[in-house]
Amino acid sequence: SIYLGDSANLQELVHQNATFDGTNNAFVDVTYTVKDENGGTVGTYTVPAGSSSGTWAWSDAASGGTVAPEQTTTYTVTCTVSPTQSGTYESVSKDATFTITVNTCSLTISKAVTGDGANPNQTFVFNVMKGDDLVTTVVLKGNMSTTITGLAVGDYTVVEDTNWSWSYTPDNGSKAVMLSSINPNGEAKITNTAKENHWLTSIVDVINKWTAKDNIDKTGHVPGSGTN
């Protein structure tokens, strides 16, 4: 299995049960054909008659057999044994399958609010960035959290919109989180301290977003239920 955004090398996943020594395959060519779920040929491994090893040929030569599926994918490997002398025996083929399971990462954002007079119903806005790309915008009330799922591996930055929450001082308005196969579930914790005089309008009246302690599925962009 791999994580979304990572890759796998098909050459390392296709294994032959037979051992060829050049004698036991002196009169047959053996070919392993790898196809994707749509039936398209991804690559072939051919052991010529009389040889103890073969060579790979990939449909995308530059890939070298490396694939990065965005969802769980099953591949079919067809082993075909073809006699080099015609009219003696017919070719024989047998199929086998293997699956590359694609897992996804998650990112939990939590907001804590401190200070005298802090209003737990105030809302705070966070932009989740991957490089220069906006992944999603999250709205949280104080002392709440939300989890974004369906994320690929990579470096993310959670940035608070301090122009919106101008009456609160964040400990750090930006948190960097690296998601990987080793660390697939990241977390960004941001604490805000209420200033002496604070005022904050509900962002729900301005943009059609959500406030919830809920899961947000990045793959579907479905807002939370709005329940705590």
Segments predicted by a language model, with ranges:
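Solvent-exposed loop/turn and edge beta-strand elements of beta-rich ligand-binding domains
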Residues: S1-N228
